Amino acid sequence: YFSKLQEEPYRIEILRPDNLIAGTSLTPTTKDENPDDNFSTDTYTVGRYFEVTDHPIMYAKPDTTSFDVQGMKVLLDVYSPTGKFSAQDIKPGIEKMISAQKKFLGDINDTEKYAILLYLSDLQKKDARGFGALEHHTSTTVVLPETMQKAQLDESMKDVVSHEFFHIVTPLSVHSNEIHYFDYNDPKMSQHLWMYEGVTEYFANLFQINQGLISNQDFYDRMSEKIASSMNFDDTVPFTVMSENILTDQYKDSYYNVYQKGALIGMALDIRLRELSDGKIGILDLMKKLSKKYGKDKPFNDEDLIGDIVALTYPEIQSFFDQYVTGETPIPYNQFFAKVGLEEKSSMINTGYFLNGQVPYIDGDPASGELFFRKGIGFNTFLEKLGVEGGDIIKTVNGTEYTIKNVYGLITSSQSWEEGSDIEIVVDRDGEEITLTAKASQPQVEETSITEMELPADSPKVKLREAWLKN
């Protein structure tokens, strides 16, 4: 932005048509209306440039609602181009979720006003395609396709907004100098994405079991899925090294693992803290202590954080970080699960040839229309037998050419392949055309599930589990 003016106050005037209103957590200092020309001017004043970037504003035709949760006013603004959804449609699920989050967080969150800005994209037009959300201190912006069904939209909002709301804790309240003085032109990354994104993602799941929104098994299944996803990445790379270098070519493709193994680091640390404190202290208590020590206006030095965590908790926590966060040792999940009376069990389950449930093994290039096998994921037994590699471009399957336009034909035809029939897939691998052949066979993948051990109700492990999930 304007050079060397990051710490100066800003006054922003926005001229808007009268039929559009602002959705934002900012309160306008003035609002000048001119009924003669059907335009009005909203004026906002903030203390420094960061506050400009930290307060998104969405102007749209009025579709807003609000509710109060334990002293916090929540604003919900929705833009739905065809009018398929309204703020009132979405309000019940959001209100239930944020009420549970506020109860879970307790006194760590003193935000007085919070805005949720939902932009629903029209896929029939040249509209937004980057779906997801971005957190701010007092608001979250969300972009999702309007084509979603109501139940699907509610579920996405629950998962996405809950994650973003928990960013109130970190990095918004607890963060390093790299975050506080972030230079968008020359970004320097922190070592602690395990906390900023990993712990946040863990909280977004933990609060749901803690507040009774999901069952114990639902929570275990989510953690199991994260373990499986994390195994598609190098499990020996120190997480702090990856985090600090996440923008480099070597590590940029590992960012998704921040939400997988990062959350699992949070889970393992939570269990270890519960074990050392006889169930009294968990990772939320740690984040409250860090928030009190630092807060949004006092960043920490990157290299000091782990030492501060050890000082605020137990000396034994140092070895946890030395092994599993700054070290190269993979987390022995079974050992941590055993502490709380859980165990992992593996079994083989059936999949489709090109789909594992809702997760595809193939993707498409919108520009070229080409189909290719995805990189960074594990394949089923059939694709492994076939010799498929991530990045292989599909030319033909059993003599038929396939592109994005007829990909569903590929899925459908594969469902009728007979056991033992000959399958031939021609792929382009690094510019070389290769023919892959195999006999059709039921594709399978190994699935690991987390289950509760059969233990008496008064078992110390059961009590520790209850403290971990419900306290």
What are these regions (language model features)?
Residues 204-205, 213-471:
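C-terminal recognition in membrane/secretory proteostasis and scaffolding
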Residues 101, 195-207:
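An active-site-proximal "capping" alpha-helix that borders the catalytic cofactor pocket
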Residues 63-192:
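Juxtacatalytic substrate-recognition/specificity segment
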